[in-house]
Amino acid sequence: INGDAKGTVFFEQETSEAPVKVTGEVLGLTKGLHGFHVHEFGNNTNGCMSSGPHFNPGNKEHGAPTDGNRHLGDLGNIQAAGDSPTAVSITDSKITLFGANSIIGRTVVVHADA
């Protein structure tokens, strides 16, 4: 997370076949929806610009978390109240912490807008 926003996010997956539970909180977001995505690279030397595009090993179209055809990194939006920490609570069955398409070592980006 770059800029005035900061936070901690946890990824938990019990087995390679289980969904990933994403929990945590982000501070400093403006009121409204903010895109929440895993990007391709774990490089933040130049802020989010160094993180590359959304993680998309299947070369699919951008989509919502419930879409069958979507970037693996498309985890939807989080809703910020603007005056308090923003909770992150996502369960996703497409991302994984195992194997070649693991998100481990990649960058989580919270976008300014949805």
UniProtKB/Swiss-Prot annotation:
Annotated InterPro entries: SOD-like_Cu/Zn_dom_sf, SOD_Cu/Zn_/chaperone, SOD_Cu_Zn_dom
Enzyme Commission code: 1.15.1.1
Enzymatic class: oxidoreductase
Binding site for Cu cation: H37, H39, H54, H111
Residues involved in Zn(2+) binding: H54, H62, H71, D74
GO cellular component terms, semicolon-separated: cytoplasm
A GO molecular-function descriptor: superoxide dismutase activity
Reported function: Destroys radicals which are normally produced within the cells and which are toxic to biological systems.
Cellular compartments annotated: Cytoplasm
Annotated protein name in UniProt: Superoxide dismutase [Cu-Zn]
Catalytic activity of the protein: 2 superoxide + 2 H(+) = H2O2 + O2
UniProt keyword annotations, A-Z: Antioxidant, Copper, Cytoplasm, Metal-binding, Oxidoreductase, Zinc
Family: Belongs to the Cu-Zn superoxide dismutase family.
Residue ranges the record marks as coiled coil: none
Keyword Endoplasmic reticulum set for record: no
Species: Drosophila tolteca
Highest taxon of source: Eukaryota
Cofactor(s), by name: Cu cation; Zn(2+)
Compositional bias per record (Basic and acidic residues), positions renumbered to this chain: 59-73
Subunit relationships: Homodimer.
Disulfide bond residue pairs: none
Keyword hit for Isomerase: no
